């Protein structure tokens, strides 16, 4: 693959990026607001999705070029197991974009055990993809089987976050910093994915292999900007400016919310993966869960089928 040149990206068509709403977009906000995308001649149009069905339909139809999404969605939609009736046969992950902390099963305060979830309703973004598969594994570990509970589709994490606060359901899985914020509000962390797995690859930057090949320099520039934004966020001398960017993009939040988000997303040991490093064992766990719970059942490939590290490797060589 040709190593990236940062002198001739000004004619590149805008990149259409679709993300879930939330503080985990902080590196995207930094790359946008501090000119890291523009530095390399990139224009990035960011759209927030209400859920994975909209996101993957958009990617399949070519309205989105890049998505930040759960690794499980990459596998599901490549293999025809997604919630939406679309297949993205060349879907690939190209970079990790998530903290290393495991998702937590957050419940109403009166739910004190798995047995208390019998007959209750639990919320997911989509019933066949994403964190839903971890939820099923946790419920099975807790002695519950399908039929002991109901599943309702609420869409992306903001919908689940607000729905739990409105008491629309008994519980749902949340990544950081939403799980931490809910604990601060008095909701119960009943369990975490760490009780059923040691590794799990969460959010990744994903695209279509065909688009990546045709737009390799633009993709490399995008990944370089995102990696540089993560490095900038880890630098404690930038915290005041980082909080200002947070408030600009989440105007309903205050410095306390920013502090909570920062403490978990950029924790030196469990925060965002440096250099976008993907956890291959984490992808293997995604495949294990999908082999067990995915529909229709099918034989899945090795982690390398769903992750191409070459674009990130080239981008990082160009930035050193």
Where are these regions (language model features)?
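Short polybasic/polar patches that bind polyanions
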Residues: 33, 38, 140, 183, ...
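A bilobed periplasmic-binding-protein/Venus flytrap-type ligand-binding module shared by bacterial periplasmic
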Residues: 30-32, 102-112, 201-217, 271
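Secondary-structure end/capping motifs
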Residues: 213-297
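Pocket-lining segment of extracytoplasmic ligand-binding domains
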Residues: 71-73, 82, 159-251
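Short, solvent-exposed loop/beta-turn-alpha elements that line the ligand-binding surface or hinge
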Residues: 39, 85-86, 195-198, 269-279
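Short, glycine-/small- and polar/acidic-enriched structural segments
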Residues: 2-147, 151-155, 160-163, 170-176
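Conserved C-terminal helix/tail region of periplasmic/extracytoplasmic solute-binding proteins
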Residues: 284-320
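A short small-residue
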Residues: 2-5, 203-210, 266
């Amino acid at each position: 693959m040709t190593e990236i040149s940062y002198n001739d990206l000004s004619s590149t068509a805008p990149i259409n990026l679709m993300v879930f709403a939330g503080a985990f977009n902080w590196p995207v906000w930094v790359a946008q607001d501090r000119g890291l995308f523009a530095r390399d001649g990139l224009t990035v149009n960011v759209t927030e999705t209400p859920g994975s069905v909209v996101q993957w339909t958009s990617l399949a139809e070519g309205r989105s070029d890049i998505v930040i999404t759960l690794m499980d969605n990459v596998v599901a939609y490549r293999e025809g197991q997604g919630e939406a009736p679309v297949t993205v046969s060349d879907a690939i992950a190209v970079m990790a974009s998530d903290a290393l902390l495991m998702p937590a099963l957050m419940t109403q305060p009166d739910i004190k055990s798995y047995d208390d979830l019998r007959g209750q309703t639990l919320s997911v973004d989509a019933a066949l993809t994403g964190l839903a598969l971890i939820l099923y594994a946790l419920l099975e570990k807790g002695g519950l089987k399908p039929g002991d509970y109901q599943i309702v589709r609420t869409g992306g994490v903001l919908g689940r976050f607000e729905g739990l606060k409105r008491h629309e359901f008994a519980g749902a899985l949340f990544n950081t910093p939403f799980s931490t914020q809910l604990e601060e509000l008095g909701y119960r962390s009943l369990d975490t994915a760490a009780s059923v797995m040691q590794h799990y690859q969460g959010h990744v930057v994903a695209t279509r292999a065909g688009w990546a090949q045709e737009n390799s320099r633009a993709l490399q520039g995008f990944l370089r900007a995102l990696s540089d934004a993560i490095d900038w966020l880890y630098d404690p001398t930038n915290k005041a400016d980082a909080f200002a960017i947070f408030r600009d993009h989440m105007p309903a939040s205050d410095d306390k919310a920013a502090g909570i988000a920062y403490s978990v997303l950029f924790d030196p040991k469990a925060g965002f993966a440096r250099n976008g490093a993907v956890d291959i064992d984490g992808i293997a766990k995604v495949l294990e869960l999908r082999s067990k719970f995915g529909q229709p059942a099918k034989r899945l490939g090795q982690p390398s089928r769903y992750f191409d590290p070459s674009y990130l490797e080239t981008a990082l060589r160009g930035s050193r």
